[in-house]
């Protein structure tokens, strides 16, 4: 039996009901008012739910059944790389030596953990073609900002603090211009050409003596490889700027091509995406930043180094460093999972990851091409972007298609992004899905396309089988109710 109207845990609370019992107090009782300032002592008890253990288990188990994750179903969320997270990663992350280590304990007692971090840095240096890596940033956008702050420090150290422009393509992730703004730069947008790639001629028009950097994802958010990357890098370098690599799409080129060999000066990675840290629930993530030699002095400190004696040490003596960007040394647990993944796969395995990710995306694209518009009809990399323009003419929007997918148990693709594709549907299958899964999803997408032609109302009014139908998203955004208030 399924309770369609799931109550809040506060609403099943009954005064005096408890889930656990404690032993009788065997030490002198202390009055909080005697040991805490008066302003820190509550005048009345906090309104916390009073429930039994059984109530708790049933409540959260019921909620868990409403969640969708990669362990429960296909998750083709474009530009998010929702691949399966191997459970060996979880087992290793739970080793007592990793799970119980504390960032403030003496370095001499944490050499094993530090060795893992150092080896992970070394692996990421090899994968990216950079010269040094910091594991400090907590996630992707944090890595972007960290890299931009290093670029800013580099220019200022060279007496070129006037460089205040960061160039981003019109297909860029929204975090790129946001990170540039937070780092104190002005964003300049460069257009895409008819092939979905950066328009070189438009790029020539916007570069100049005030150019600090070009931010680029390769392949880009259309799933297309920027074929002119060498020319673009040379152009930016010719005016004294730096070229930054957004690692969101590294899954498409891993062990096939390296950002450092393409002319990039720095790169951020998403270990929670490409290297199988669980994600989708708001964190934790890991966004390491790799740099070429001339940016090494500006890395966040402390920098993890290995001494001549083979010991591992956090080096704080970095006078040009941009300083800490996160307490302690990054999200250690995610780094352990990424290290486990890299060691499990090896170079050949990582190469196969890329090959299957690209194969799966191209297979799906060709199966769906007859039923949806394909703005850029060419081989893609790890993801591709369809357009619901054809369906829009029939009164069915991309949003409707996404909602209809829920009826079949699928998480929808990314919708309405990139912004330069009308009614966009961005699909990324990843390498971990079978042909059977891809076919089943494509069959549903084809069915929805036919429904848009023959019975559009069933798509327009979807979803029909979920616990809740369409929410008033505008009202939710403008007047959010973020905490429980007793009636």
UniProtKB/Swiss-Prot annotation:
GO biological process: glycine decarboxylation via glycine cleavage system
EC nos: 1.4.4.2
Entry's Gene Ontology cellular component terms: cytosol; glycine cleavage complex
Membrane-spanning residues: none
Keyword Nucleus appears in the UniProt entry: no
One function term, GO molecular function aspect: glycine binding
CDD domains: GDC-P (cd00613)
Catalysed reactions listed for this entry: N(6)-[(R)-lipoyl]-L-lysyl-[glycine-cleavage complex H protein] + glycine + H(+) = N(6)-[(R)-S(8)-aminomethyldihydrolipoyl]-L-lysyl-[glycine-cleavage complex H protein] + CO2
Cofactor: pyridoxal 5'-phosphate
PTM sites of type N6-(pyridoxal phosphate)lysine: 273
A Pfam family annotated for this UniProt entry: GcvP2_C
Keywords per UniProt: Oxidoreductase, Pyridoxal phosphate
Stated role: The glycine cleavage system catalyzes the degradation of glycine. The P protein binds the alpha-amino group of glycine through its pyridoxal phosphate cofactor; CO(2) is released and the remaining methylamine moiety is then transferred to the lipoamide cofactor of the H protein.
Subunit structure of this chain's protein: The glycine cleavage system is composed of four proteins: P, T, L and H. In this organism, the P 'protein' is a heterodimer of two subunits.
UniProt protein name: Probable glycine dehydrogenase (decarboxylating) subunit 2
Biological source species: Lysinibacillus sphaericus (strain C3-41)
Gene giving rise to this polypeptide: gcvPB
